[in-house]
Amino acid sequence: MRGIVRNHGGGTVGQMTAMSLDRADSTPKSGASRGELWLVALLTLGALVLRLPFLGDHNADIDEQLYALIGSQMLQGQLPFVDLWDRKPFGLFLLFGLADASGLPAPWSYQLMATGFIVIGALLLRRLALLLVDRGTATVAALLYIVLMTIYGSHSAQTEAFHVPAMLAMALLVRDIRHPNALRRAWFAMLIGGLALQVKYTVFPQCVFFGLWALWGRYRAGRTLSQLVAIAAGFAALGLLPTIGVGLFYLAIGGWEEFWFANFVSFFLRAPAPMGRFADQYTIFVMPLVVLTVAGLY
């Protein structure tokens, strides 16, 4: 932030932020072709090298084995919740089904797909970092994203590999409430959030936060209360649209009870873990994140 203050010392914080966002948006378009290909190659290589010990290993993690089984059986006409049970959303199994349809053997198919999502997340994070730092530092942040995602459970094809990039995309779209197309970008962000919900429902709080931030922007833009209520309803409808669509599908085929129980009831019937939600060793495990957070605030 000190760099922003030096460049725009005469403006308010809001003006400085808006100017920095505009500067990031005005990155030369040619950089998205030749000039940025090296970046995609670098991040892809970094992701492959870091994840190499796990690629091709069926036992890299246990959850994906079930996701892959259900996804592959979807191609044979079987359905999640009705024929094969798990509490994860339909969209996650669809992703694994698409990976299986690629023709690559499991686990290569879904692990390489997850690697692609990791690279996309790194690119999105770099885009966010460019609002505050130079290109080199932003690239380091993108590489650090790949490292941390690998260390903290997304070394194979856990759900975070897929829905974290969606959250980063939402942040990019709604971050600038003064953007001339802020509302249009917010509509798109809410749809992305809805798709992320179909990967894992635990992204709901983040989606609500981004929706409220976008709504605050409309309030600052002078929208009336009735307009804000209508916009909020539209945000909610777009965010729930993918899940509603899946629910209507199961209702049409007579599988509504199975869908409802798996998605919205079974979670509350889970037995608590013996160690509790947070084990004692987690404190040490998250210390690197605390250090990075403090450094970032500085």
Where are these regions (language model features)?
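Loop-to-helix entry region of an early transmembrane alpha helix in multi-pass inner-membrane enzymes
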Residues: 90, 94, 103-120
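Short acidic/glycine- and proline-prone juxtamembrane loop motifs at membrane-interface regions
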Residues: 155-163
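Membrane-interface alpha helices of multi-pass inner-membrane proteins
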Residues: 184-201, 207-213, 241
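Transmembrane-lumen/periplasm boundary regions of multi-pass, lipid-linked membrane glycan transferases
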Residues: 228-298
